[in-house]
């Protein structure tokens, strides 16, 4: 992937994959491939959320108004 996708684009892609798998009308091989893509997207989304949370914590702590989020 030469250009990093935005969080919202990755989330939309994951939602499409989940919908496909929930419908159950895909071949086993395709379902496995889609599941793997979904897991990769899920990890990327979680990493993006973790990074955003750390950024917010730093900003809030620099202001002196907030402590570490859990």
Swiss-Prot record:
Q: What is the protein's species of origin?
A: Streptococcus sanguinis (strain SK36)
Q: Note the subunit structure.
A: Heterooligomer composed of large and small subunits.
Q: Which gene produces this protein?
A: xseB
Cell location? Cytoplasm
Q: Output this protein's name.
A: Exodeoxyribonuclease 7 small subunit
Classification via PANTHER family: EXODEOXYRIBONUCLEASE 7 SMALL SUBUNIT (PTHR34137:SF1)
Q: Which GO terms describe its biological process?
A: DNA catabolic process
Single GO molecular function: exodeoxyribonuclease VII activity
Q: What is its main location?
A: cytoplasm
User: What Gene3D superfamilies has UniProt attached to this entry?
Assistant: Exonuclease VII, small subunit
The protein's enzyme class = hydrolase
* InterPro entries, sorted: Exonuc_VII_S (IPR003761), Exonuc_VII_ssu_sf (IPR037004)
């Amino acid at each position: 992937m030469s250009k990093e996708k935005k969080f919202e684009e990755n989330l939309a892609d994951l939602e499409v994959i989940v919908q496909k798998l929930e419908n159950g009308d895909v071949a086993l091989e395709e379902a496995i491939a889609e599941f793997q893509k979904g897991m990769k997207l899920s990890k990327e989304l979680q990493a993006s959320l973790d990074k955003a949370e750390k950024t917010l914590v730093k900003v809030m702590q620099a202001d002196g108004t907030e402590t570490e989020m859990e």
